[in-house]
């Protein structure tokens, strides 16, 4: 893997698929995709106090943090990706929002499509947002 960011939709989906494949070849840890700070400031519905949106993938599981409102959007999105299922929802007493773990038993390209849809539709990012691979 030689590139670590992308901003065009097709490039982002390829970045996710390549990152997931590289993660699988390494066989340990997780891969984290994080939205660029400039893209966060361009998003109208994101609360900057909640931090930068990110999505992690490891061992067939997607991990995201979201608000209750974003969780409802995520559930709606999952209806379009029937192979993906919520495994666990964790609510912390110390922090607002929820952590969601989603079973993602699919090929890297399909997972990449889902990850891009999470950023665009759950977090409400504009079409041309930049995402980085920040941990592999």
Question: Where are the model-predicted features located?
Answer:
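Mature extracytoplasmic domains of secretory-pathway proteins
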Residues: 56-86
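Residue-level "edge-of-site" marker
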Residues: 90-92
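Haloarchaeal acidic low-complexity proteome signature biased toward cell-envelope/secretome components but also
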Residues: 1-58, 85, 94-101, 109-136
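Helix N-cap motif at beta-to-alpha junctions
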Residues: 67-68, 104-109
